[in-house]
Amino acid sequence: MRVAYHTLRYGRAFLCQWGRGKWLCRRGGVQYMRRYRIISEKVKQAGCWLLIIVLLPYIITVFINGPKIITASKADETMVKIEKNGKMPVEEYCIGVLARDMPADYEKEALNAQAVLIRTEVYRMIQEAGGDGTLPEEAEDEFWTEKQMKSAWGMRYAENYRKLKNALESTAGQVLFYGKDLAMTPFFNLSNGYTRDAKEVLGKEEYPYLKIVECPGDVNADNEIQTVILEVKSEQKGENKGTTGIETLDVEIQETDSVGYVLKIRVGDKVMSGEEFRNKYELASSCFTLQPYNGKLRVTTRGAGHGIGMSQYTANEMAKKKQGYRKILKYFFKGTDIKEVTEIIKNV
């Protein structure tokens, strides 16, 4: 047993003994438990409360916005160069593309998934351009400037911009890989109920991760089915004269893919792809049927967009069901992995 003499209280001596895990002090037959243990407990409690107060704002931020991944400074500093707008940080460019390509009122996880796809495509373009950050000419029209965002969103500009910025920050530095290479990451608005197999569309085995995926909810979208009436050019009159018209009613769909999108169509003596026909006559989709109608051609389309990759509508529906962006991307891009852009930055 350890024994110690203390003169800590008013200069008077106390005989203290160590026992049962604490000091016991006696004076005049009355025991006094030494206060050091009590003080120590109070200090610990105060420290815990202080730690909670310091960390609480961070915890709330992570709960609302998700954790922010810190990437290498070189990746953060990557610049892209486009002709009319000069140089800008790659993440700033991605915000402009996200603003143009997906409605800002979509769910957070859908926006996050879209952000990863956009960043991946931008780095693919940088690699293909030789790594100096110069983007192809068409990239000029693929993003919105601040002026365009303000024009489109009006009073909701600040709110919408913050949402898109959060999507880029929540997925900071993340890109989609297939094996050792950046994946091709196409997306579109709305399917006919299924996405398309890239091999059927492009005739290449190059993208085995772009397969047919069910999107059952897409068929319930308001703009799933659209109808366009095409007039024969020679018959156009009045206000319709000069608008896009078809050369002849002698039109035949010659080939479709396994989910119903047109691969080949004949218009008179000319044969073109379904996507060419869609673009020429400004159709929502190359999944369409044809029907003569009072000397005109009625074209009924299903879905919106080319149909390859991620259906934004289904991605948003998945996000509404609390599915995260990683699960969304895995659903549409089979066999791919999300990796850090730092794994390729040395080659950029």
Residue ranges and their predicted role:
Residues 5, 9-348:
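Conserved, single-site charged/polar hotspot
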